[in-house]
Amino acid sequence: MVSDFESTLQKDSHSKSLVRGGGVHPLTLDAMNYLSNLADYSHILEDIFAEWPPPPRSSLPESYFDTPQSDDSQAPAISLRMAWLILVLLCKLDGKAEHYKDVSLSYIFLTNNLQHVVSKVCTSNLRYLLGEEWITRHEAKARQFATNYERLAWGKVAASLPENPTAVISPAAAKEIIRKFNLSFEEACQKQRTFVVSDPKLRDEIKESLARKLVAVYREFYDTHRLTVGGERNVGSYARFAPEDVGNHLSDLFFGTTESVSSPSSSSSSSHRRRLRFRS
């Protein structure tokens, strides 16, 4: 039964199927449901897996368990087997992420799916088979994927704001900064309006991180320079978004809505090439 499951994972006939918005893939849902249910019978499976040859040591990342790499022989056979099966799943998901044309969406996909894997481990008997070190390691990896998403998707928006938002500059320069920020922010929101973050806690964490990087700086710049560019009425002629509007639009992200932020603006998918790996 377990051999059949691993074979199904390895073959994965839908390897090029993409989930809209970068959400959790059906393969992830099915595989983790199966493994979490299987973990409930660990007391029976221990003796069975003890007779199986262990996965190749080179295929398991360093620090994969609480037990040091040099002492893998002490890890229960069932723990090694569960870790191996999840690793096979993660490698398949890594390959699926490569099929997204938008690199930032690839990282949303990786974040969502790894977060689901970790969540299922934490809320099942897999937690006791894999150990706290495994959980900590993969939680950190999910956060890194989210950080990579923020950098790729919102880096241009953040870069449009000055490092010192209260520095004295000319009205023309202030007007141009506000204009560029509004344009890049609108483009980013438009591009990502269908993106999904499935886990509510993770969704809020990403929004809060973006708000710290964008809303706070933009608000400080906006409040400092709106009078120098001619007052509230004048700034509204080229600033589509006030600071509170930026916060509101960020709050609406990651639910997979198809509503447009504004009239569609052209934006090309990133051609940035990458290797996205769950493995170390």
Give the residues covered by each predicted segment:
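Extended, charged coiled-coil "stalk/tether" helices of large eukaryotic trafficking and scaffold proteins
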Residues: 95-99, 114-117, 123-130, 140, ...
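Extended alpha-helical solenoid scaffold regions that build the rod-like backbones
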Residues: 1-129, 221
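Short, charged, amphipathic alpha-helical segments
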Residues: 134-136
